Amino acid sequence: QSETKLKDERFDYNVIPYSWNNTWGGGREDMVYKLANAGFKTVMSNSSAFYFDMANDNDMDAFGLNWSGYVDYFDTWAIDPQDIFANRALNRKHNITSDYILKTTKLNPNKQDNLIGIQSQLWTETVTSETILDQMLLPNLIVFAERAWAKKPYWISYQSSAQEHKMTKDWNQFLN
């Protein structure tokens, strides 16, 4: 787990940090919450959900990198920016245990306004043509827009099999 501590006297609170380095299981998934809880207006730009230049699987012909794991559309669509560990399907997919989650920092409900948004990015060091750009940008952008602007679905932090079924149904409907 990350042992990062924030010391108030070192920071200018007029800075808006963008928290991005949060590979699943790497111990930094909660950095955005640590910053928000410390009083920073901050933006979540998670590499494990919102980087469009990550490969979506280990296919040798897939475009993108894998330093932050494999990121598919479901990772972007199913994440809850206010509680990234809320969705049990994502936790299972990335082998995140309840013991691991207990050791992480949660977003303080009184500091939720400090999480001012989410941002996606597409780094272009692996984009060598317009076709590759289109393949990496457009499907991801549609999925990201759904998460960024749509009303938070009730199942996002599901605790029952009925809610998981509803999530799966909504996911299939979104895809089709």
Labelled PLM ranges:
Residues Q1-N176:
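Substrate-binding groove of N-acetylhexosamine-processing glycoside hydrolases
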